[in-house]
């Protein structure tokens, strides 16, 4: 810290909030008090994964609009936040960790890597309609990974790798998205699979031309 700048700083605590004008930002994480500032200061053994676990996670509410900002949070961090019972609903989700499938090596033999992404339990709880993924120019790391993109399929997904700078604006009621490239056209358009109503098995009585009475079953799709 540069004392000559005379800037007061506060270390946020999970569960506390600050006002940003008329918006309110609530801190959900990190939930671990062993955090060390910087990648190596006072903790030379911290690797990138450990540092990412201490990403600040916040929920911002402005009027009727809400945003969930997750930084580079890893699955351990997100699971702790989910377990706390925080309100995770949001219209806009900043997808954790660039859209990586950051499964741990010990989880791979269990088959988790093949199906759900690490943060599906978070994605399902947000109910978001817009997802933002920060990934590198030319996307050499090929994110988001397929599992993540599949779990985000109900949202409009915007990636910085092909959209450049992405701005989501709110007036407290309405949201708008603009990007450096391609305007408001998403990188991947979301879709919602309409659930088909289950056909009902209806019992009907049929009077035959004979003296016998038949009571067959028929399948009627409800209107």
Predicted regions and their residues:
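Active-site regions of enzymes building and remodeling cell-envelope glycoconjugates
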Residues: 5-9, 155-157
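Core dinuclear metal-dependent hydrolase active-site scaffold
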Residues: 7-92, 164-223
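A glycine-rich, often tryptophan-bearing local segment used as a flexible ligand/cofactor-contacting loop or short
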Residues: 1
């Amino acid at each position: 810290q540069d004392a000559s700048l005379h800037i007061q700083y506060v270390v946020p605590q999970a569960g506390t909030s600050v006002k940003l004008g008329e918006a309110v930002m609530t801190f959900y994480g990190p939930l671990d008090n062993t955090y060390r500032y910087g990648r190596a200061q006072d903790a030379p053994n911290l690797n990138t994964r450990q540092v990412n676990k201490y990403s600040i996670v916040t929920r911002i509410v402005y009027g009727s609009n809400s945003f969930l900002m997750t930084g580079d949070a890893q699955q351990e961090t997100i699971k702790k936040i989910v377990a706390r019972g925080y309100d995770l609903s949001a219209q806009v989700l900043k997808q954790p960790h660039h859209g990586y499938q950051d499964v741990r090596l010990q989880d791979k033999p269990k088959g988790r890597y093949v199906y759900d992404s690490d943060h599906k339990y978070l994605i399902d709880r947000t109910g978001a309609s817009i997802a933002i993924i920060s990934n590198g120019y030319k996307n050499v790391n090929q994110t988001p990974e397929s599992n993540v993109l599949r779990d985000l399929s109900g949202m409009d997904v915007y990636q910085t790798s092909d959209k450049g700078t992405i701005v989501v604006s709110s007036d407290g009621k309405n949201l708008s998205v603009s990007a450096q490239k391609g305007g408001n056209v998403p990188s991947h358009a979301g879709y919602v699979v309409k659930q088909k109503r289950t056909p009902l098995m209806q019992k009907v009585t049929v009077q035959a031309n004979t003296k016998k009475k038949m009571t067959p079953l028929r399948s009627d799709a409800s209107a």
